[in-house]
Amino acid sequence: MAHPRVFFDMSADGQPVGRIVMELRSDVVPKTAENFRALCTGEKGFGYKGSRFHRVIPNFMCQGGDFTNHNGTGGKSIYGTKFEDENFQLKHTGPGILWMANAGPNTNGSQFFITTAKTSWLDNRHVVFGSVVEGMDVVKKLESLGSQSGKTNKKIAVVDCGQI
C-alpha cells in the first residue's frame, strides 16, 4: 500500500507562497500518520485549514498545528487531547522531516514541525512520521520569514490542505 500524501497551500500575510506535499509513514507509525492525515482533511470537523505556523527558527524548523489557540499552547489530536509516542524508528535525518511537537513523553496532539536542517538530537524524543516530497522551496521561503526567537515577520497560514 502506498504511503498517504497530504498537502498544505501556504500564504504569508495573505499572499500565496506555494504548496507543500508531504508523505506520511503509515507503515511505521500508523496512529501518528492517521492523526496528521485526518487533521489535513478536516474530516473530524477540525484540523489544520486556516491555522498558522506560529514559530519559525531558521536552520532548525517551522512549527504549526495549533488550530485552537494559534500560538503554540493549543491544538488537539483526533484521539482526544493527547496521545502516546508510537515509536522512534524514524530519525531526524535532514531538511524536510515531519515530526510531532510535544511537552514530554506521550503528549502528542496536533502540533508538528518541519525540519530545515538535520536535528539528530531530537531522535528518541519526538516521533517522526513523514517527510516533504514536493515544495521544499516553499518551506525555505517560510523559513526566511522566521527569527532566532521563533517570531515570524509575516502571518504564515495554511490556506487549504487535504489528502492527494
From Swiss-Prot:
Enzymatic reactions: [protein]-peptidylproline (omega=180) = [protein]-peptidylproline (omega=0)
A cellular-component GO term for this protein: cytoplasm
GO molecular function: cyclosporin A binding; peptidyl-prolyl cis-trans isomerase activity
Reported tissue expression: Ubiquitous.
UniProt superkingdom: Eukaryota
Any single GO BP term: protein folding
Keyword Cytoplasm set for record: yes
Gene3D superfamilies registered for this protein in UniProt: Cyclophilin-like
Domain PPIase cyclophilin-type: 7-163
Regulation of protein activity: Binds cyclosporin A (CsA). CsA mediates some of its effects via an inhibitory action on PPIase.
Annotated keywords: Cytoplasm, Isomerase, Rotamase
InterPro entries, alphabetized: Cyclophilin-like_dom_sf (IPR029000), Cyclophilin-type_PPIase (IPR024936), Cyclophilin-type_PPIase_CS (IPR020892), Cyclophilin-type_PPIase_dom (IPR002130)
Family: Belongs to the cyclophilin-type PPIase family. PPIase A subfamily.
Name this polypeptide is given: Peptidyl-prolyl cis-trans isomerase
Native source species: Blattella germanica
